[in-house]
């Protein structure tokens, strides 16, 4: 039997109450959905207050907190949880490594909480930040495994947190934006480290060397660069971020004009493997495999599939010892 779930949407048309236009609906973020549904179903509230607006359940409208005249219809939809969809891949900045992590897990979680609270305020997403913090508070005195599993789940959600981490990742190493990404180390670093630690050392049962796939939209210049590297003496490179892939090729092919195909060369060490996080993710149907920062790979070849009109770039994941 197909499992069902509830999602809330707001009408995004320029004139949201017009009956002459085709309706356009935008989905609330994962955390907003959770807050809304809990207020509607569990708490039986007449309304729920979010960061920028509140929702009147009786009239099914979203109302601006700053201007009550700004209203939009909302709707509650029951969908199949295993719908065939795959979200855009998400990224993470390089983490800070604490040598005393074994004895400081509670302190690290508390630092992550403070950082998320700060970033939530900057983004105007205090409600989302509060919800995320509540989840971390529940596990801060638990085992490393339970803390890591919570962080994986939070990372898998559509929220301001992963978007800010994604944006920061793009700036790392960019001298023109050095002040920006360095300013995020204190606030985003602790949460990034919790993720990194779990992926590196915990839950070996989730390790996998299966072939995984990732869709991307590349320019002609970027594709040419990959082709150039395959002809160079050293085709090895490394991931600077957390990289999300899927075990499902068909789903990955939904995105962009290019498909990356990742294959692990050897099972020489658990550190060379990748983690299947589908059982921990909010979206298990995506069949997500997460590759941690620092993983090295070789660019093997670049091909063009005429039938699908896509470039396919084949990469082999290698261990640290193979990069020397």
Label the predicted regions.
Residues 1-127, 138, 193:
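Eukaryote-biased intrinsically disordered, low-complexity acidic regions enriched in Ser/Thr/Pro
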Residues 209, 294-296:
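Tight coil/turn sites that cap or link beta-strands
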Residues 307-324:
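Short solvent-exposed strand/turn elements
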Residues 126-278:
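Internal glycine-rich, Lys/Arg-flanked active-site/core loops of soluble domains
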Residues 13-16, 53-55, 61, 67-69, ...:
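Conserved beta-strand elements of beta-rich interaction domains across eukaryotes
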Residues 269-293:
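Flexible, small-/acidic-enriched active-site or ligand-binding loops
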Residues 21-24, 61, 67-69, 73-78, ...:
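Short coil/turn segments at secondary-structure boundaries
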């Amino acid at each position: 039997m197909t499992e069902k779930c509830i999602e809330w949407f707001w009408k995004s048309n320029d004139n949201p109450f017009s009956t002459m236009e085709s309706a356009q609906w935008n989905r609330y973020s994962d955390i907003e959905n959770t807050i809304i549904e809990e207020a509607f179903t569990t708490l039986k509230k007449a309304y729920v207050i979010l960061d920028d607006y509140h929702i009147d359940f009786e009239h099914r409208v979203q109302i601006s907190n700053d201007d009550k005249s700004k209203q939009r219809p909302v709707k509650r939809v029951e969908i199949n949880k295993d719908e065939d969809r795959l979200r855009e891949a998400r990224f993470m900045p390089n983490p800070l490594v604490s040598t005393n992590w074994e004895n400081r897990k509670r302190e690290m979680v508390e630092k992550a909480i403070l950082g998320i609270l700060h970033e939530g305020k900057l983004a105007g997403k205090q409600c989302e930040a509060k919800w995320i913090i509540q989840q971390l508070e529940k596990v801060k005195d638990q085992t490393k495994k339970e803390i890591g599993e919570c962080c994986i789940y939070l990372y898998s959600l559509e929220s301001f947190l992963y978007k800010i981490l994604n944006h920061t990742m793009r700036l790392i190493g960019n001298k023109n934006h050095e002040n920006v990404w360095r300013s995020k180390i204190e606030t985003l670093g602790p949460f990034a480290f919790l993720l990194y630690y779990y992926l590196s050392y915990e839950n070996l049962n989730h390790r996998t060397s299966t072939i995984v796939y990732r869709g991307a939209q590349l320019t002609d210049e970027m594709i040419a660069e990959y082709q150039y590297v395959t002809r160079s003496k050293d085709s090895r490179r490394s991931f600077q971020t957390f990289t999300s892939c899927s075990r499902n090729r068909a789903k990955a092919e939904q995105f962009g004009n290019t498909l990356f195909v990742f294959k692990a060369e050897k099972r020489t060490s658990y550190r060379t493997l990748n983690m299947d996080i589908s059982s921990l993710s909010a979206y298990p149907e995506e069949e997500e495999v997460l590759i941690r920062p620092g993983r090295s790979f070789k660019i093997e070849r670049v091909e063009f599939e005429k039938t699908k009109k896509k470039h396919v770039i084949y990469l082999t994941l290698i261990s640290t010892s193979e990069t020397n």
